Structures are given as structure tokens and as C-alpha cells.
Amino acid sequence: MTETAKSEAVAASDIPKGAWVDKYLPARLRPYARIARFDRPIGTWLLLFPGWWSVSLATADWSPGASGVGQTLWFFVLFGIGAAVMRGAGCTFNDISDREFDAKVARTADRPIPSGAVSVRQAIFYLVSLSLIGCLILIQFNPFAIGLGAASLLLVAVYPFMKRITYWPQFFLGLTFNWGALLGWAVVRGDVQAPALILYAGGIFWTLGYD
């Protein structure tokens, strides 16, 4: 790539400049924060909200007492960490899968993998590390919720490739990003019932709207 092409790619890059990543992280850690999109937390919030909504919905008609309230808050914390970590894992997997396409597009050519800031091997190791943290969070829940959470990995694995075969990748993004609507209910109640399914369906349409 020529210097002119590099300059044009940087100018068109979707990586925000001057974010907290640039201000506070050591230079060697910045590419890893960027590949996980920690510099763009909106995606984490969009993944997190359905889970929080579902936990709140599942506990709305309960009177659990002080210990139950503490447990609900703990679920909120676990979902928060889990959303950040698994969104990062999903973005890393997406960038690994799309690295050849990203290298040819000005908007994405400056991303860590196509730019050479992170090798594919390093990205895979990072993906495994994030996934292990996600697993540690998932096993804090009941067996049904653990199985349900693990099932979401199929959607995570499929989504990057849907962009290549359908004009509606947002639908598959909605299926993936709103899985927390099912998981939140399952974490509290140990099953999935109609309110969670309705919330999940609504979340999918919400994703179609914002994406």
C-alpha cells in the first residue's frame, strides 16, 4: 500500500481518534482494545440492555427480600462484564473472519488485523482468552442458563458470514445481540417463558431499526 493510500485509509477509517484508548492505554495494548471495540462501547450497551431488561422482567412480580435483591444486582454485574467481554470476543472473531475483505476497504483497512498491528495468531489467542472469561461468568448461573448461553455461540459463529449471503444480516445480528432477553429470564427462573420470548422478538425488531 502506498503512503497516499495509507493516508486515505486512515482518513476514512472507522476507528475513532482521541478516544480513551489513545489517552490512557499503553501503545501495545491499544490494538487489542480496538479489535474488541472497547473504544466504542455503544455495542456493549446494545448487547447488555436486553439482558438487564429480562432480569428485571423476571423479578418484577417477586418479593425476594434483601438477599434476593443482592442476587439480582449481582446478576446485573455479571451481565455487564459478560456483555463487554463477549462483545469483544464477537468483534474479534468478526475481524478474523473478515480480515481479507477489511484490507480492501478504506473504512476498515486500518483495523488491527489488516493493518498488521495484531497478527491472526495473536487475535485467535485473544479471542480464546475473552471466551474463557465469558465462560467463567456463564458458569455462575443455573444449568439451564448455562446451556442456553452456550447455544448463543452458534449465532456468534454464523453472523459474520451472513453478510456475504444475505441482504438482511441485521436480522441475524438481532438474533445474536438480543439473546440476553432469553438468558436473563433463564438466569432468574431457570426456564424460558412467553414474556422472555416476546421481549426477544421485540429486541430483534429494535435491532433492525437501529442497525
Identify what each model region corresponds to.
Residues 1-5:
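Soluble N-terminal domains of membrane-associated systems
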Residues 7-30, 91, 95-118, 211:
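Cytosolic, membrane-interface loops and tails of multi-pass inner-membrane proteins
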Residues 28-43, 117:
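Membrane interfacial helix-start motif at the N-side
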Residues 33-34, 111-195:
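Intramembrane alpha-helical segments
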Residues 37-57, 178:
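The first (N-terminal) embedded transmembrane alpha-helix
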Residues 50, 181-184, 211:
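Hydrophobic cores of alpha-helical transmembrane segments in multi-pass inner/ER membrane proteins
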Residues 52-97, 107, 131-138, 146-157, ...:
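Membrane-embedded alpha-helical segments that form the functional core of polytopic membrane enzymes
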